Design a protein with these regions (language model features):
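A glycine-rich helix N-cap at a beta->alpha junction
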Residues: 78-91
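Phosphate-backbone binding interfaces of nucleic-acid-interacting proteins
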Residues: 541-662
């Protein structure tokens, strides 16, 4: 058995229950599960928590649109989240719901404690509020008048509220981050938090709302509900037994958390708000917050309206659980966003799972049966290529240890497949089918098959955290069991004389893309149909195309005011994301004989690659201004629906660059 290395408490972000999670959301639970299984193999006593975030204005509005109570709505969505988490074989130890009675009771106590000690005070809030992000913003923080995080419209908000004294703890948090370099990972996330939020100065945080009711009431002032982020973040301590009046032994054992695994879009809440709340509660901070990248559909944001959303259950139906796990783990870089398309999934399935792994196991077991009746024996008759194979196999564990210590999961799984590739090369080098023709080479053939069987056993054991079902199927075919982690750098432990299965199972049969495509088309058509139904429900029975959006009229302008604005057709020559912003793109736009640099808040709906070559409508004489530190010399015109989806205004007919819009 691996040496007991102590506790390892890890969490995912709890999933927001506004709808069914797609594969981009599901990526996090698969990633977390791989880490949890790996840590267990290493010898840690892992406690792995996940769950659902179930309060907030957005959920109340969704429930009203569905004509059911908020609790009925979150019960349905939370059940769907848990079903999908179970479907992808996640081995969590605890599934928390923020509507759980014990959580709500503890949140009330936490709020009261912070109020009693002077960290929370009563005041009034006036500013802008983003409902999808559940975030408050000042006018100066908005980008193009919209939420700087998601790019959607914000609404004026003025209400009595309770506030948390964030500024009181800011210097202490800055010192902590500077003296704990592993606290925020990757480093780019740390730099973003320091430069964009902490160093410019923190404002006190609104921690209650009165404009909606779906939340945890403030115990001593029940017309207020607790701000969703104070409610949601505390799940990491409430569910394991924290109590301001006296915590449980489980809490004392598990806290502080060793890892909070979250999406990069909520790093601010977990590395600024959460540690400051903990400081106020006089609790130690988590050891690490890791903000993973996003998984994008073909480089684009997933959207039902486009029919391009990929759900985990659809992937599992078409390819199986472990193929789904393999794709999202293998394709996600350490820091940058990954890309998923149906074509890429099929390509990886055939090249990696069917060819490299499945073919290797099948050939090895089949040759053992064909040449030795399935009995695997080490004869000690070695060849020149054996040493290199053994060196690669026995070194793989330590290479994986190095990668997993930095949470480079994609790199770790690549190391396992490098082992399998080396095994395939070993078959080509030793040519067992040639050895089998020479009776004098029988002992050498036996040794070759022993080396392959031992190598595959080690590889399967290393593969287990990532593809658990496949790893177990492999060792069953080899009539052995998964190897202990401490033994995975040793070669020759496969029991001599073991008989492998006489009926090898095809682990991954190659897929014909032509057979899959009709199923993909049906999935996409269904999504568009569901989207249209949702839009009709939201728009009072009208389709999305028929719907009318009412907006508040702005102050009238004169014709002279209008003629001051110059609109022309522009052609986008190049485009790139703005480094300091999650929503901005910077485009070089050719307008007649000139080229202007224009910064636009359209990143959530367009990738830089999509922008290049588009003909767009441009306000060309807008006074230049800097957005996120980048000069912008005009404005691209867009339409926006009530869901915040942006669509660039483009000429209906072909028009030359520079054509006047009148």
């Amino acid at each position: 058995m691996a040496e007991n290395k102590g506790k390892f408490y890890m969490t995912t972000a709890i999933a927001y229950t506004s709808g069914k999670p797609h594969i981009g959301n599901t990526y996090e639970i698969i990633l977390a599960d791989a880490i949890a299984r790996y840590k267990r193999a290493e010898g840690y006593d892992v406690y792995f928590q996940t769950g659902t975030d179930e309060h907030g204005q957005k959920i109340q509005e969704k429930a009203e649109a569905a004509d059911i109570s908020p609790k009925e709505f979150v019960d349905q969505v939370s059940g769907e989240v848990k079903r999908i988490w179970d479907l992808v074989n996640s081995s969590y130890d605890s599934f928390v719901r923020t509507t759980d009675e014990d959580h709500e009771k503890c949140v009330k106590k936490i709020f009261k404690k912070l109020y009693d000690q002077g960290d929370i005070y009563k005041g009034s809030y006036e500013g802008m509020y983003c409902t999808p992000c559940e975030s408050f913003w000042t006018e100066s923080q908005l980008v193009d008048g919209k939420c700087p995080d998601c790019g959607r419209e914000v609404q004026p908000a003025k209400e009595e509220a309770y506030f948390f004294k964030m500024s009181k703890y800011a210097d202490r948090l800055i010192d902590y981050i500077n003296t704990h370099p592993d606290f925020i990972q990757p480093v780019s996330r740390k730099n973003e938090m320091m430069n964009n939020f902490l160093l410019p100065g923190l404002q006190d945080l609104c921690v209650s709302r009165t404009s909606f009711s779906w939340g945890i009431p403030v115990d001593f002032d029940p017309k207020h509900v607790v701000y969703v982020w104070l409610d949601a973040l505390t799940n990491y301590i409430t569910k394991i037994g924290y109590d301001p009046d006296g915590s449980t032994d489980q809490f004392k054992k598990l806290w502080p958390a060793d890892l909070h695994l979250i999406g990069k879009d909520i790093v601010r809440f977990h590395t600024i708000y959460w540690p400051i709340f903990l400081m106020a509660l006089d609790l130690p901070l988590p050891k690490q917050v890791f903000g993973h990248p996003w998984l994008l559909q073909g480089g684009d944001k997933m959207s039902k309206s486009k029919g391009n959303v990929i759900y985990a259950d659809d992937m599992v139906d078409l390819f199986g659980v472990d193929a789904t796990r393999y794709f999202v783990l293998h394709e996600m870089p350490f820091e940058n966003d990954g890309v998923i398309t149906w074509d890429l999934v099929i390509e990886r399935f055939n090249s990696d799972l069917a060819n490299i792994l499945g073919n290797l196991v099948n050939r090895t077991v089949s040759m053992s049966n064909k040449y030795f009746g399935g009995v695997v024996t080490s004869t000690g008759v070695t060849g020149e290529v054996d040493a290199d194979l053994k060196a690669v196999v026995t070194a793989t564990r330590d290479r994986i240890v190095e990668k997993m210590a930095k949470l480079r999961v994609a790199d770790a799984i690549s190391e396992v497949f490098a082992l399998f590739r080396r095994c395939n090369k070993y078959i080509d080098e030793t040519t067992p089918w040639v050895l089998a023709k020479d009776e004098a080479q029988k002992d050498r053939l036996a040794e070759v098959l022993y080396n392959l069987t031992e190598s595959i056993t080690i590889g399967a054991s290393l593969l287990h955290p990532f593809l658990p079902e496949t790893a177990e199927k492999i060792v069953v075919q080899l009539s052995t069991s998964l190897r202990d982690f401490d033994e995975l750098n040793q070669f020759g432990l496969y029991p001599d004389g073991t008989k492998v299965t006489d009926a090898p199972e095809i682990l991954f049969a190659r897929i014909d893309a032509k057979e899959i495509q009709p199923k993909v088309d049906a999935i996409q058509a269904k999504q568009k149909e569901e989207y249209e139904k949702e839009q009709k429900a939201l728009n009072g029975g009208e389709s999305a195309d028929e719907a009318v959006i009412d907006i508040d009229p702005k102050e009238e302008i004169t014709f002279d005011d209008f003629t001051k604005m110059q609109f022309q057709v522009g052609e986008i020559l190049s485009c790139e994301a703005v480094a300091k912003s999650k929503k901005l793109l910077c485009s070089q736009v050719k307008i007649g004989n000139t080229v202007k640099q224009i910064v636009s808040g359209i990143r959530k709906d367009y990738t830089p690659e999509e922008m290049v070559g588009k003909k767009v409508m441009v306000l060309v004489n807008l006074k230049p201004a800097k957005l996120a530190g980048v000069l912008s010399e005009g404005m691209l015109l867009c339409a926006e629906d009530e869901n915040g989806t942006l669509s660039l205004m483009t000429p209906e007919k072909p028009m030359p660059s520079g054509a006047e819009i009148c």
